[in-house]
Amino acid sequence: SIGFDLYRKSGNEEEVKLNEEPITLSTNFQDITADRNKDNTYRLCFAGSDETLDTYTITAAQASAGLPYISIPLAGTTGVSSEYYYDANDASVGDLDGDGVYEIVLKRLLRSSSSTEDEEDESEAVQMGPWHTTLLEAYKLDGSFLWRVALGPNVPVGNLTSFAVYDFDGDGKCEIAVRTAEGTVFGDGTEIKDTDGDGKVDYRVEGSAHIHGGPEFLSVLDGMTGRELARTDYIALGKSEDWGDNYYKRSASYRVGVGCFSGTTPSILICRGVYGKMVLEAWDFQGQELKKRWRFDTSDGVHGDYAGQGNHSLSVGDVDDDGCDEVVYGGCCIDHNGKGLWNSRHGHGDALHLGKFDPSRKGLQIWSCFEACPFKVGAALRDARTGETIWDFPYSGDMGRCLVADIDPDSPGCEMWWYKGNAHSCTGADLGYGAGSSSMSYNMAVWFSNSLNRQLLDRSKIDASKEKRVFTIYRYEVTTINSSKSNPCFYADIWGDWREEIIQVTSDQTELRLFTTWYPTDSVSYTHL
């Protein structure tokens, strides 16, 4: 087994070894002897070796205050607009410079009088004043600002900007895949000009909440600089009516993801459409250009019955155990070759989860809820290989939320529940807790404490499943994003010891705060990210 030695240097004192025996039973260490009034630098080595694997310094200011977070100051935006403010929204992480440490990629949205959120039901009219309406920014965990991309007037406030951070070309550094348009200004100052020669680069329409046309692109950005590495045309708009309305809202249902559709290399997945026509495309990036792998189109004369089966999110995974990823998109699944794999015809919904939820069943399962299922089903557990329903909850309305997580040590596998519903076992048995005014959160699940069961993250607090408080995050002057969704900017296993860190923005929108656990544990696992 792998063992570690840990050393500490306090201020100008000599370095000391903290462990008497090699650390083999955990991937964390709680130092109870450190002088909090001094900077403490920790050095990690393999047991019996003096070769440094990593170092990290906890400053006296951090330690003396006893704060369970690190701060990343947000860059000012007066260079973008002296009149408008930009608020932090969704974030992701990736190793942008190849140094083995994650950086943060953050989306910032234009603040307005009626909404600062990335809401699915965004009804606010397009902002006509400022030129740049959505920002992407990159930060190092030490607070250093790396770059900014201003996506321009044709990528407005709303749920219209999804992005993926991944090492698409295998060079050890992550790129960013994002939808761009005329007017986008990249991290090196390069701008997408008038590409179609129509004499304009601003396609906003006064009084409308959505863009009515203009060239759209898929761009791949260099993670270190934010400059554009490659560009191709995005899935074409065509007619608004094809996508389910005549006012350009449903045609702006964009999704992005990452899938290993070849079985060996990652591809960029882009999607357009949920309620009517749906198009998905897979693109490969190998350092200089984008090459289309496949296209799935419900108007191709073959997959017409898949129309309207999309979702407000998507999940990617190998559902049929063939070594290649598939795309689970609401009521349907697209095979790794871009062909329809199955269509359960449940329709679309707000939440969808793919994973190994029932250990007694072969393969993966899907837990999701639906807005207006034709079978009058509010939430269902389906077999990911076939789309077959395993069990479901009858409901004729819009079931807006559901969640699945292993929260109960007394119940095998994962537990599942929905808005105001009791927790159920993976086989559908009612476990008798959760419903009512004190119902469990159905928002997000997180590993934060020393338990192998997950805890529930909602509204800047973490609770165990049966109303036991684990951490009150809102005490540290942070806020959530996306209005009623009450999301953090991001959460994942950033440090690598399998517990998850949580990134939230301060209430005054001046910095990100990355919260990490202080619970020691002797449970070990590979990193979850």
What do the PLM-derived regions correspond to, one by one?
Residues 35-48:
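Beta-strand-rich modules
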Residues 527-528:
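Conserved small/polar residues in nucleotide/adenosyl-binding loops
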Residues 49-65:
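Extracellular fibronectin type III
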Residues 2-37:
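Recognizes extended acidic, P/S/T-rich segments that occur
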Residues 89-96, 161-169, 255-261, 312-319, ...:
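Beta-propeller blade termini
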Residues 236-241, 245-424:
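Beta-propeller domains
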Residues 107-131, 179-212, 371:
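Short, conserved, GDST-rich strand-edge loop motifs in beta-rich repeat architectures
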Residues 98-108, 170-179, 263-271, 321-329, ...:
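Acidic/hydrophobic-patterned starts of short beta strands in beta-sheet-rich repeat architectures
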